[in-house]
Amino acid sequence: MMEVTAKLRGAAISAQKARLVADLIRGKSVAHALNILNFSNKKAAVLVKKALESAIANAEHNNSLDVDDLKVSTIYVDEGISLKRIMPRAKGRADRITKRTCHITVKVGV
């Protein structure tokens, strides 16, 4: 089975939120997965769609695979780096904010 990979690294969303969307399209055909992502109302859907479209383009141009036969064989979301930020509070105090990122990996295959 031929598999083609695409990675989106450092996506500006937490892995926990991105996994909710990734679970929706795992194992689906590429056309069905794109349809689900187009109508999903989540920020992560835009990022996952970008990675999926990249994987489709890789399969089409690098490996000459037919797009109609492709399905999402594997999709997983790993944690990326966390950016530490400071939120000023009252009386000279400060709280630490962590802006989380993630790495989205999509594999499509025949």
Curated annotation (Swiss-Prot):
GO cellular component: cytosolic large ribosomal subunit
PROSITE patterns: RIBOSOMAL_L22 (PS00464)
Biological processes annotated in GO: translation
InterPro entries: Ribosomal_uL22, Ribosomal_uL22_bac/chlpt-type, Ribosomal_uL22_bac/org-type, Ribosomal_uL22_CS, Ribosomal_uL22_sf
Keywords: Ribonucleoprotein, Ribosomal protein, RNA-binding, rRNA-binding
MF terms in GO: rRNA binding; structural constituent of ribosome
NCBIfam families: rplV_bact (TIGR01044)
Subunit record text: Part of the 50S ribosomal subunit.
Family stated for the protein in its record: Belongs to the universal ribosomal protein uL22 family.
Free-text function comment from the UniProt entry: This protein binds specifically to 23S rRNA; its binding is stimulated by other ribosomal proteins, e.g. L4, L17, and L20. It is important during the early stages of 50S assembly. It makes multiple contacts with different domains of the 23S rRNA in the assembled 50S subunit and ribosome. The globular domain of the protein is located near the polypeptide exit tunnel on the outside of the subunit, while an extended beta-hairpin is found that lines the wall of the exit tunnel in the center of the 70S ribosome.
Protein name (Swiss-Prot/TrEMBL): Large ribosomal subunit protein uL22
Species of origin: Acinetobacter baylyi (strain ATCC 33305 / BD413 / ADP1)
